[in-house]
Regions:
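Short acidic, Pro/Gly- and aromatic-enriched capping/linker segments at domain boundaries
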Residues: 1-8
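Conserved short histidine dyad/triad with adjacent acidic residue
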Residues: 9, 22, 31-49, 83-87, ...
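Short acidic-glycine-tyrosine-enriched beta hairpin
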Residues: 22-24, 67-86
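Short beta-strand His + acidic residue motifs that chelate non-heme Fe in jelly-roll/DSBH
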Residues: 44-46, 64-65, 82, 88-96
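Short, conserved beta-strand element in jelly-roll/cupin
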Residues: 47-64, 106
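A short hydrophobic beta-strand segment most commonly corresponding to one strand
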Residues: 81-85, 95-112
Length: 120
């Protein structure tokens, strides 16, 4: 299974995350695919996701944080499932010496995402 973090907006209007895995159930129809690279040590302040999307990290290690202080570390090979398209959003910072190379795969908001949360 592929490690994944799902970012979503809770009923309180703030972003939260759940750790889990991406499953291989079925194909999903994507709206767009975008490749992007950001220089080492970069950061991006508070923002919601522009659309529901997978963000597949190819290189770089990042610290993500929600407005309420929840944090997780995204590593190469991990998938961020960004669903916090409204509310307080999240921020990130590159914490290693590598550029963040990634692939964005955008979906419709009503697309069922193949995600299984870790057992608590």
């Amino acid at each position: 299974m592929i490690k994944a973090y799902k970012l979503y907006t809770g009923e309180d209007g703030h972003s939260h995350f759940t750790e889990g895995t991406v499953t291989y159930k079925d194909l999903k129809e994507a709206n767009s695919i975008l490749f992007k690279e950001t220089a080492p040590h970069a950061s991006y302040d508070w923002h919601p996701a522009p659309t529901t999307q997978y963000v597949i990290t190819l290189s770089g290690t990042l610290l993500f944080e929600t407005f309420l202080g929840e944090q997780f570390t995204l590593k190469p090979g991990d998938v961020l499932i960004a669903m916090d398209t409204h509310g307080s959003g999240h921020k990130w910072q590159l914490i290693d010496d590598q550029p963040w190379k990634r692939v964005y795969v955008a979906f419709n908001e009503d697309t069922a995402i193949n995600f299984v949360p870790d057992a608590e």
